[in-house]
Curated annotation (Swiss-Prot):
Residues 130-158 form the KOW domain. Keywords: Transcription, Transcription antitermination, Transcription regulation, Transcription termination. Belongs to the NusG family. One of its GO terms (biological process) is regulation of DNA-templated transcription elongation. The keyword Protease does not apply. The keyword Transcription regulation applies. The gene is nusG. This is Transcription termination/antitermination protein NusG.
Length: 181
């Protein structure tokens, strides 16, 4: 078994959809077995996004790496067995099953910087850009195509130019009233 005396970052493959529960389970097992000195952070890199379903705004979580959990640990026989004993953990990524390789500090810093950029404010799940073509799917302009002129993420609204009888008409629409082409 490979031994490391420094806490390094490893990637665990997990059942998709269970990443949060696995991370919590690892934290609980570490406390229960008094192995805090061998483990650092356990994280599931994600951000909050706002979805609009049936006209209702709903916050949901978007995982950057679905099916994976990042864990900071000192790799030895007991820490390896603790992690592998957690239900729904498929194994470590990189190296061999009994000799996992840590990810580089550069890769970890890239992930952490991305998490810092995200911030606390949830972003819309669908991002629109001026000049992009969208299709109106609700309201009086339903089934018309239009070009996005302005985007207001605070109010979840778009200003779209819709061509009606050969003339371009600006229309304000909610995010839920349009879909990307």
């Amino acid at each position: 078994m490979y031994k490391s005396y420094k806490k390094r970052w490893y990637v665990l493959q997990a059942f998709s959809g269970f990443e949060g529960r696995i991370a919590q389970s690892i934290r609980e097992h570490v406390k229960l077995k008094k192995m805090e000195k061998l483990f650092g952070e356990v994280m599931v890199p994600s951000e909050e996004v706002i979805e609009i379903k049936a006209g209702q705004r709903k916050k949901s979580e978007y995982k950057f790496f679905p099916g994976y959990v990042l864990i900071q640990m000192i790799m030895n026989e007991s820490s390896w067995h603790l992690v592998r004993s957690i239900p729904r953990v498929l194994g470590f990524i990189g190296g061999t099953p009994d000799r996992p390789l840590p990810i580089t500090d550069q890769e970890v810093n890239t992930i952490i910087n991305k998490l810092k950029q995200v911030g606390d404010k949830p972003r819309p799940k669908t991002l629109f850009e001026p000049g992009e073509t969208v299709r109106v799917n609700d309201g009086p302009f339903s089934d018309f195509n239009g070009i996005v002129e302005e985007v207001d993420y605070e109010k979840n609204r778009l200003k779209v130019s819709v061509s009606i009888f050969g003339r371009s008409t600006p229309v304000e629409l909610d995010f839920s009233q349009v879909k990307k082409n």
